């Protein structure tokens, strides 16, 4: 599988703006900038690379966990994961996941075991 994103940046670091376009069409010319990286007080839609990394990890983790649960004969009704990315001194320090799930007939211990398996085998986890 090959996935492509096009990123365009115009201008200098502080005042420039950019646009992200996904091959899939999920977003087209989504704006990003230094201002949306750290604050977005103007109410304009925008994102930043760190937010996209957190979203990719949470989404990939949920999908992987769903498959891991299915392989163990559990059917999730809902998996809800928050990803909190810590960005300090110009570097990503960590990404923490907070998971809540609705899965019938599973013990807390088994759910945690399978969630850890999914975390360890999620393709996005492997690059972070």
Locate predicted features.
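Extended beta-strand/beta-hairpin segments
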Residues: 1-55, 62-128
């Amino acid at each position: 599988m090959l996935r492509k994103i096009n990123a365009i940046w115009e201008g200098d670091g502080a005042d420039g703006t950019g646009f992200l376009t996904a091959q899939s069409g999920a977003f087209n010319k989504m704006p990003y900038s230094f201002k949306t990286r750290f604050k977005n007080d103007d109410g304009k839609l925008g994102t930043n690379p760190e937010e996209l990394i957190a979203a990719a990890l949470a989404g990939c983790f949920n999908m992987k966990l769903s498959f891991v649960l299915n392989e163990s004969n559990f059917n999730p009704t809902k998996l809800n994961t928050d990803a909190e990315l810590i960005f300090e001194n110009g570097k990503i320090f960590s990404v923490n996941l907070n998971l809540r799930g609705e899965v019938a007939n599973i013990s807390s211990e088994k759910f945690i075991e399978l969630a850890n398996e999914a975390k360890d085998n999620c393709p996005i986890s492997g690059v972070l």
